[in-house]
Swiss-Prot record:
This is Forkhead box protein C1-A. Disruption phenotype: Embryos gastrulate and neurulate, but at the tailbud stage show stunted growth and loss of cells at the blastopore. Embryos continue to develop but display shortened axes and abnormal gut and heart development by the swimming tadpole stage. One of its GO terms (molecular function) is transcription cis-regulatory region binding. Residues 175-323 are annotated as: Disordered. Keywords: Developmental protein, DNA-binding, Nucleus, Transcription, Transcription regulation. DNA-binding transcriptional factor that plays a role in a broad range of cellular and developmental processes such as eye, bones, cardiovascular, kidney and skin development. Acts either as a transcriptional activator or repressor. Binds to the consensus binding site 5'-[G/C][A/T]AAA[T/C]AA[A/C]-3' in promoter of target genes. Upon DNA-binding, promotes DNA bending. Required for cell viability and resistance to oxidative stress in the eye. Promotes cell growth inhibition by stopping the cell cycle in the G1 phase through TGFB1-mediated signals.
């Protein structure tokens, strides 16, 4: 609303005339307008449409805005379109040595741009701020030849191309000084890290390979089959391989003897063992006795029990009396060589150096089974020469042999026998001679014959060299396969 007041009128300077009590602000304004003619053009828009527009516009505007001539502002007072970085760069480049002090920068800017001649405190602070924050400006200390206040400022050699095409109006990018030392340290750190990681990876790979090799070795050791020969028994001797026949696995094992009983036997070739042995294993342990078969008899039991007082206490009274009088009855079954390996597992170890090939001595429990299976009329023998009956089977022959021929040649297997084993030997250990004539008698008649045989042995004079052997030809099988005999447990 500067058009209200005419420039030529003294009232246009904003001087309000004195207002008395009767005069109001609006009257004074109207008087000032009448004096200067400021409000004469207000009626022009009302009469604008009744007259030609061009003439009415010229008449109204000539009176309203004609006398107003605004004071023109000089071009030097306009702020230049350059940034403070560009102004500082101009000042440094215009210097003769390409370096200038802070005061020289101020003087250059004020001489070139009159806009910065006023308000010096504001823009000079901005100049100092840009000098310290931008890396493109480098501070050079003043030398002694040119004493003065302040240091020189110059441009970094890499910052001359930071403006596009030499124009200070536009900058390409913010300049960042390259720190060579920092780059070198970064490269060294990266190289060291790579080497460290490489060494760690090599060590880890080597450790993994060692672990894999150890695991594979453990698997190989676990997968190897354990040989039976490598298993040590209670007395430190290697155990023999067992027979794989399922029918022979039910035979009870013979317990290993004590060290005292084994030492008291006096036999240098006695081998203590707590497992059953086959003929092949016995031959491998005794290579100098390979022509002879194994033997187990009551003689071996008696010799082992003589060295063990505890075992002699467990014997029944008939066996104790016979051992005191020097009787060594041996019930031995002699087999042919063709059938020796079949019945090898139920019998225990004992080598014979003087007996012929094919003799095999079985334990007393097997004899009790044979007696129940092949029951018949038993003839008691009160004399050393056994008497035969007319109904005797032709395949079974009974012969009395001298215990002296076996006592010097056999290597007894010493072992303390349990009570269930000795109870069987109590009934069968005193048979001096017996025949098995027929197989038509039942078990009760066989038991009566055994009782009469035992009573006859106790009452008859004792011959210390008598023993009983039964020889089986190879044509006769030990176990009957015809099924004629039925084993009934209710009879017992």
């Amino acid at each position: 609303m500067q058009a209200r007041y005419s420039v030529s009128s003294p009232n246009s300077l904003g001087v309000v005339p004195y207002l008395s009590g009767e005069q109001s602000y609006y009257r004074a304004a109207a008087a000032a307008a009448a004096a200067g003619g400021g409000y004469t053009g207000m009626a022009a828009p009302m009469s604008m449409y009744s007259h030609p527009a061009h003439e009415q516009y010229q008449a109204g505007m000539a009176r309203a805005y004609g006398p107003y001539t605004p004071q023109p502002q000089p071009k030097d007072m306009v702020k230049p379109p350059y940034s403070y970085i560009a102004l500082i760069t101009m000042a440094i480049q215009n210097a003769p040595d390409k370096k200038i002090t802070l005061n020289g920068i101020y003087q250059f800017i004020m001489e070139r741009f009159p806009f910065y001649r006023d308000n010096k405190q504001g823009w000079q602070n901005s100049i100092r701020h840009n000098l310290s924050l931008n890396e493109c400006f480098v501070k050079v200390p003043r030398d002694d030849k040119k004493p003065g206040k302040g240091s020189y400022w110059t441009l970094d050699p890499d910052s001359y191309n930071m403006f596009e095409n030499g124009s200070f109006l536009r900058r390409r990018r913010r300049f960042k000084k390259k720190d060579v030392s920092k780059d070198a340290t970064k490269e060294d750190k990266e190289r060291l890290l790579k080497e460290h990681h490489g060494s760690q990876s090599a060590a880890a790979q080597q450790q993994r390979q060692q672990q894999q090799s150890q695991a594979q070795a453990e698997q190989d050791s676990n997968s190897q089959p354990v040989r039976i020969q490598d298993i040590k028994t209670e007395n430190g001797t290697s155990s023999p391989p067992q027979s794989m026949s399922p029918a022979l696995s039910a035979v009870p094992k013979i317990e290993s003897p004590d060290s005292s009983s084994s030492m008291s036997s006096g036999s240098p070739h006695s081998i203590p063992s707590n497992r059953s042995m086959s003929l092949e294993a016995a031959e491998s342990h005794h290579p100098h006795h390979q022509q002879h078969s194994q033997g187990f008899s009551v003689d071996n039991i008696m010799t082992s029990l003589r060295g063990s007082p505890q075992g002699s206490a467990e014997l029944p009274s008939p066996l104790i009396s016979s051992s005191r009088t020097g009787i060594a009855p041996s019930l031995s079954l002699s087999y042919s060589p063709g059938q020796g390996s079949i019945y090898s597992s139920p019998c225990s170890q004992g080598t014979s150096s003087g007996g012929g090939a094919g003799t095999y001595h079985c334990n007393m429990q097997a004899m009790s089974l044979y007696s129940g299976d092949r029951s018949g009329h038993l003839t008691p023998a009160n004399t050393p020469a056994a008497t035969t009956v007319e109904e005797t089977l032709p395949d079974y022959s009974i012969s009395t042999t001298s215990a002296q021929s076996h006592g010097n040649q056999e290597h007894p297997h010493q072992g303390r026998l349990p009570s269930w084993y000795l109870n069987q030997t109590g009934e069968l250990g005193h048979l001096a001679g017996a025949t098995y004539p027929g197989q038509q008698q039942n078990f009760h008649s066989v038991r009566e014959m055994f009782e009469s045989q035992r009573l006859a042995l106790n009452s008859s004079p004792v011959n210390g060299n008598s023993s009983c052997q039964m020889s089986f030809p190879p044509s006769q099988s030990l176990y009957r396969t015809s099924g004629a005999f039925v084993y009934d447990c209710s009879k017992f």
